[in-house]
Amino acid sequence: GNGTLDLPKDGSVPAFAAGTAVTEGGLGKLTLSQLEQVLAGDVVGSSFSVGQDSYAYGGTTRPEDFELQMQLLAAYFTDAASRPEPFAVIKSSLPTQLDQIRATPGGALALDGFPMLSSGDRRFAPLPTKEQIETAELSTLRQVVDTGISQGPIEITIVGDVTVEAAIEAVGETFG
């Protein structure tokens, strides 16, 4: 997908909650708590972000858990649940954070400066307005992210203590 560039200019898609909604929502058959229990003892992790021109899953692991890490990322890629509870938590906590950020000159500039520099394009604001938070819907976010991920190109980057052969094999087994 094209990340921020896929979003409408009015900022109506709650991209601010994407990382939390996607990873903390767990998988289709496993909540985050259940997933953590299943993976206890393994060193794997996952993150999700909306970049300016991409959506990105990321993870950090150790060599002995590399294959499991790839399986986890592939599972999020194909079956992220985006449950409503993490989305509700970020919606309830973000207005207070906005007040704190806006209380400083640098914070106010960050919140309002980027949209002004981009002709009012709210996609480039680092955080939403309170009104956007209030009207944000998880289903809207999910629709845009799912479409972008399912129709966009996939780029996989692996860095660390893993051979090229092991990386190719793990990608082939998980992402195809």
Predicted regions and their residues:
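M16 family metallopeptidases and their MPP-like homologs
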Residues: 1-23, 27-79, 90-99, 104-135, ...
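A common structural junction motif
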Residues: 75-82, 174-176
